[in-house]
Amino acid sequence: MMLLRLGPPIGARSVLAWNRSCRVVVREHEERELSALQRYGGCIYATWHQRMFWFFSDFGSRHVTMMISRSKDGEYANALALRLGFYSVRGSNSFNGREALSELIELLKKRQGHKAGMMADGPTGPPRQLKMGSIRIAKETGLPIIPMMYGAKRRIVFKSWDRYFLPLPLTDVVVLHGEPVFVPSDADEKECERLRRLVTDRMNEMADRCDAWWGGEPLGKPGFDLPLKT
């Protein structure tokens, strides 16, 4: 109880301070996002779980809605997300997932200008493979999926299922905005799968570009991952 009360405020301040210490040297194709928001009134941001640390603050500042697990860990994550500026619906692939996804879809339909943020391969993978939930949301709302990726010149890479990483404080960061992807409302199962693979491929290309920006390797190596070139 004490952790749930004190942890999220401290955690939110720490995340914001950490990311604000970094310097965004490139924010590529931001006009794609701005144009989609102006034209369609909302969007579905998609990134990999591996890249989520930066987007805790980036998506939070956009006040996007995320699906967060109803587990005990999810209670803490939800409190932290609210502190960072997110809205949330509660559910996961293993518990209450369909209901939460339907709730998110209805929310996006009703609120002009509302946005969703998806850790598109989370919470347990397989890594860097888009799950069908993002496709379903796009199909039923008519909103575009906008892939978002970031890379850091210096980072800490963990031995997790997806090699989750953190940018080191004071490092340079690059943020890439992908081309919007639409899913027709009459798309059948075959077309949805084609689009799922298309978005997956585009997101992985973006992630690899971020990693190669300063000469790094795709996914990185566990430990302190420093650039091959400065």
Predicted regions and their residues:
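Membrane-anchoring hydrophobic helices of lipid-metabolizing enzymes
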Residues: 1-61, 105, 201-230
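A cross-family acyltransferase "interaction/gating" segment
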Residues: 130-189
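Residue-level preference for the first positions of well-ordered beta-strands
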Residues: 42-44, 63, 113-117, 146
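Catalytic core of membrane glycerolipid acyltransferases/transacylases, capturing the structured
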Residues: 42-96, 141, 157
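Short, charged beta->alpha transition segments
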Residues: 74-78, 100-108
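Catalytic-site beta-strand/loop segments enriched in glycine and acidic/polar residues
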Residues: 104-141
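Active-site and donor-binding regions of nucleotide-sugar-utilizing enzymes
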Residues: 95-99, 127, 153
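Alpha-helical membrane-targeting segments
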Residues: 1-21, 76, 83, 98, ...
